[in-house]
Amino acid sequence: MATANNPPSGLLDPTLCEDRIFYNILEIEPRFLTSDSVFGTFQQSLTSHMRKLLGTWMFSVCQEYNLEPNVVALALNLLDRLLLIKQVSKEHFQKTGSACLLVASKLRSLTPISTSSLCYAAADSFSRQELIDQEKELLEKLAWRTEAVLATDVTSFLLLKLLGGSQHLDFWHHEVNTLITKALVDPKTGSLPASIISAAGCALLVPANVIPQDTHSGGVVPQLASILGCDVSVLQAAVEQILTSVSDFDLRILDSY
């Protein structure tokens, strides 16, 4: 359902959140892992701060054009995967991020962002044709593997496990995924497995008192760790990392961009 403040979206379908699909996601998510260790090493002209700055700009563009959280998450994943295999100069960094937004919006949005809008958002620092050429290069470098398992994809599975058929499921789904996209602006968070990021987001936002008593046992973090089959300490560390990333998130950083 669409509102003035939210992009059009459908209701969560429990059929798409069956255990077999969830376990398939857990199995293939390592294929899409990224790393923040490339900055200052393989990416000699880029720093982690520059990546965070670009990520914040990409988030703000999606917010301005009312794009879903999945678009931000996929665009950042595409960017970070590209940075693992291709050196990018400072001069082309924003154009590269814009190309990632262009591809991600085509895959994950009902109303993809236009090349004209992206050029405008970047203060016309590149032309439409230059952006299209950058999109082609991105697709070629990634061998057209443009989809990924995202943290925002896993949220629905975890919330259904926690909340069952709660009438507030869609509300928490939107809130958790918005938090996740803010955290993903930090490349350190993006290097974590998607399921861990999503579970940490759920742990930070979903209060224990909204979880049915027959499923709630020992706290939200241990319950989520049990669902994922991971150590509680691993998930707790991710919670702390995401809390740090979200605390550092500030759109005002763009004033110096």
Swiss-Prot record:
Signal peptide: none annotated. PROSITE patterns: CYCLINS. The keyword Iron-sulfur does not apply. Keywords: Cyclin. SUPFAM superfamilies: Cyclin-like. InterPro entries: Cyclin, Cyclin-like_dom, Cyclin-like_sf, Cyclin_herpesvir, Cyclin_N, Cyclins_cyclin-box, K-cyclin_C. It comes from the Viruses. Gene3D superfamilies: Cyclin-like (1.10.472.10). Belongs to the cyclin family. Modulates host cell cycle progression and apoptotic signaling pathways by acting as a cyclin. Forms an active kinase complex with cellular CDK6 kinase. Promotes host S-phase entry of quiescent cells and activates host cyclin A. Triggers host apoptosis by inactivating host BCL2. Interacts with host CDK6. This is viral cyclin homolog. The gene is ORF72.
